[in-house]
Amino acid sequence: MGHQDTKLGIPFLLAFVLLTCLAPPAWCVASTAMSRPNAGAGPTPVNIYIYVADIFDVSGSEQAFDADVVLVAEWRDPNLAGKWTERQSARLEDVWEPRLLLVNQRGTSALLPQRVEIEPDGLVRYRQRWSGSFTARMDLRDFPLDRQRFHVQVVSLGYSRDEVYLIPDPEGKRSRRAEKLSITDWTLGPTRMEIADFETAPGMKALAGVQLVWEGKRQFGCYGVQVILPLIMIVLMGWTALWIAPSMVMPRMSVSITTMLTLIAYRFALGRLVPNLPYLTRFDYFTLGSTILIFVVLLFVAATAYFVERNKTTLAERINRWVRLAFPVVFGAVLILIWRV
């Protein structure tokens, strides 16, 4: 009886195997296409296209920019060629894929499902859109007249260039950025694709990678009106102390000290614009020069008060007159030296 059950079970087992092979694409793909295409014939070529759909913000204090980035990757898998007569869709984990990773992403979210399209000739196409923050190493010495270099770098995780050859946009037409962007305080230049392998650690084999690169220039108008102009007005407020008669000691001291404290508070309020840096920016030099200039005015105000108290009013007025004339000349020189392009 048991022998007959075994005979009856064999046809059912064969039928199950046959149905498995004729199942939907995801089933068959998983069983036949998990090995790297052309593994014995050199590196597998993968075409990479990167499109920056939008840029929302550039943060100097965080050394990052917020953007929407679209990635398209295409490669040919001979194991999948000829299996279907029409385009098929499959899960990403059911086919071999180059394990693409955004190197400089910081807290991005994938917006599309992890799927691929398979053409009848074996062409596999993967699309994904990421939204979030990307790191950007910035040189802020010229802030806020600085130019920066931005990039989005993609690598093949676990594969060197000997195994996977990432080709940056062979046609040179599909990798670019959108013409209209949300960001308003930067002027961005054209993009270009380039090979950029990623070294995970010193001495380790570099991962195959490419990147989309573009440069940007900060628009000075916004900072000139909202930051620099108010600071100039604060400095000129300190100059008014020199237009008060040297005999009016308390009003002169009050204006000078108030200007000094306002400058210090203003500098702390604007500290969020840039990170803590081992060097001074143009803006730092400007605030430092302005603070020193107001401090010198404060010293001269104190000196003239000393001479007035000792009945040397003529000397105090002479000193005050020369300092009052020299102030705009020195301040103008500071402006020219620091803000010259």
Where are these regions (language model features)?
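C-terminal ends of transmembrane alpha-helices
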Residues: 163-165, 190, 268-269, 336-341
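Short, Lys/Arg-rich cytosolic juxtamembrane segment immediately N-terminal
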Residues: 6-10, 217
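Sec-dependent signal peptide hydrophobic core
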Residues: 9-14, 323, 327
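Bacterial N-terminal signal peptides
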Residues: 11-25
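Intrinsically disordered, low-complexity peripheral segments of secretory-pathway and membrane proteins
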Residues: 29-79, 272, 279-341
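Soluble non-transmembrane domains of integral membrane proteins
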Residues: 29-215
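Channel- or pocket-lining gating/hinge segments that regulate access to a cavity or pore
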Residues: 211-330
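Short, low-complexity, charge-dense intrinsically disordered segments
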Residues: 1-7, 17-20
